[in-house]
């Protein structure tokens, strides 16, 4: 649970541009993992799919919170 809190704290400290970069990097990594799973017959660590998706969702949530704080 501590690792998740550290990630959230780090994400909250980032600027909007840094959050965009974090989201882009995680989406690229998720795409690469999906491509690897589809194109190769080797075992892929399937738990990484959900880890990437959750990281993306957390970053998008924090980005929306920052946007609401500025406009709301």
UniProtKB/Swiss-Prot annotation:
What single Pfam family name could you report for this chain, choosing any that match? Ribosomal_L29
State the UniProt keywords alphabetically: Ribonucleoprotein, Ribosomal protein
* Gene3D superfamilies, alphabetized: 1.10.287.310
- What's in the GO CC field? cytosolic large ribosomal subunit
GO biological process per UniProt: translation
* InterPro entries with a match to the protein in the record: Ribosomal_protein_uL29, Ribosomal_uL29, Ribosomal_uL29_CS, Ribosomal_uL29_sf
One of the entry's Gene Ontology molecular-function terms is: structural constituent of ribosome
Q: Which family does it belong to?
A: Belongs to the universal ribosomal protein uL29 family.
- NCBIfam families attached here? L29
Protein name, as recorded? Large ribosomal subunit protein uL29
Organism (species): Chlamydia trachomatis serovar D (strain ATCC VR-885 / DSM 19411 / UW-3/Cx)
Q: Which gene encodes it?
A: rpmC
């Amino acid at each position: 649970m501590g690792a998740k809190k550290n990630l959230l704290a780090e994400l909250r400290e980032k600027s909007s541009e840094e959050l965009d970069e974090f989201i882009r990097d995680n989406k690229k990594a998720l795409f690469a993992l999906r491509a690897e799973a589809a194109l190769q017959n080797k075992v892929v660590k399937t738990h990484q799919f959900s880890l990437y998706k959750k990281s993306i969702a957390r970053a998008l949530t924090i980005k929306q919170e920052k946007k609401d704080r500025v406009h709301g």
